[in-house]
Regions:
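Conserved catalytic core of the tyrosine transesterase superfamily
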Residues: 1-321
Length: 321
């Protein structure tokens, strides 16, 4: 993170170090918004020595141009920072008013076979640059990283933060330690994906012999890739041959839908397969997996007929699943 320049500098540095060590730091939103809050305090309270309730409440107040969700995104890093200080007895400031989360209606992109072929063809055709280590690393990593998302349904964050010790290349199992809600779970890899990871591990180890992260970032001294890296590379590969809008997270949706679609003519064992899918995708309760009912035409009726259970489609925010 950029250097803090307000009276909060020391506490912000300690907070950032703690979040990074806990694998809870989000470069895309935390860094930007915490930096803006730091500048706000420096400008408006140049003589202050301690954080006050007024500073926090004024900054976190919902602006006229903001929706509830955009306000939540802007202030969450500050709320987290305040909670960090309070848990250590460094402040008595209470949480500011946090707007209620708005449920968004979201229909993810439905991939066609042609689009997926185009996308992975683009991933496989990244040009060589033997003298540029970062480009060599990118050429090795991008095709494997996105195939892992496609074939396993893991979240983009889970893939980014995989350590080498989390990937069992002997048994073909991923240990997902950092997940939404921090629920550890395991994912069994398809044989073809396991073989690809073995080849990748051999190639990337020559560039990063003692790497900590399974997918190391040259620009971060071997640390994990950022959310922006995933988004930018997906966008570049996607639009090379495709036109419709899509985002990386939708590979997870595709994984769930393809699995569920393949079961619709099976009565026996349907519930067990749904439970397995739920666990492998890191859902703490099977109700979370019901979100995908709304994405497969007629599936709710099929499930009700096969399991004698009413498939009630929950109102959820897609990013939660």
């Amino acid at each position: 993170m950029r250097d803090s320049t307000s009276f909060l500098a020391q506490q912000i540095r300690a907070y950032v170090s703690y979040q990074e060590a806990s694998d809870h730091w989000n470069d895309a939103s935390y860094e930007v918004n915490l930096h803006l809050f730091d500048k706000y305090c420096e400008k408006n309270y140049p003589n202050a020595a301690n954080l006050s309730q007024e500073m926090v409440d004024t900054w976190c107040r919902k602006r006229k141009t903001e929706s509830n969700n955009s306000c939540r995104s802007r202030i969450y890093a500050v709320v987290s920072f305040v909670r960090y200080l309070r848990s250590r007895g460094l402040t008595v400031i209470t949480d500011p008013v946090i707007p209620r989360k708005e449920v968004r209606e979201y229909i993810p992109h439905s991939f066609t076979e042609e689009e997926l072929r185009n996308f992975f063809a683009a991933c496989d055709s990244i040009p060589e640059a033997p003298t540029i280590e970062e480009q060599r690393s990118r050429r090795i990593t991008v095709p494997v990283f996105f195939r892992l998302l496609y074939s396993s349904g893991i979240r983009t964050t889970e893939a980014r933060l995989l350590r080498t010790g989390d990937v069992d290349l002997d048994r073909g199992i991923l240990n997902i330690r950092y997940s939404k809600g921090h629920d550890q779970h395991f994912v069994v890899l398809h044989e073809s994906m396991l073989e690809l990871l073995i080849q990748y591990d051999d190639a990337i180890s020559k560039l990063y012999p003692n790497r900590e992260y399974f997918f190391p970032a040259r620009s971060r001294n071997g640390g994990g890739h950022t959310r922006a890296w995933v988004q930018n590379n997906f966008r570049n590969m996607w639009f090379k041959y495709n036109s419709g809008y899509a985002v990386p997270y939708e590979l997870r949706h595709n994984y769930a839908i393809e699995n569920i679609n393949s079961w619709t003519n099976e009565g026996f064992g349907f519930t067990a397969k749904l439970l397995y899918l739920s666990k492998s995708m890191g859902h703490s309760v099977i109700e979370s997996t019901k979100y995908y009912y709304s994405l497969v035409p007629g599936l709710a009726d099929i499930i009700e007929a096969q399991t004698d259970e009413s498939a009630v489609i929950p109102e959820v925010d897609y990013e939660s699943y």
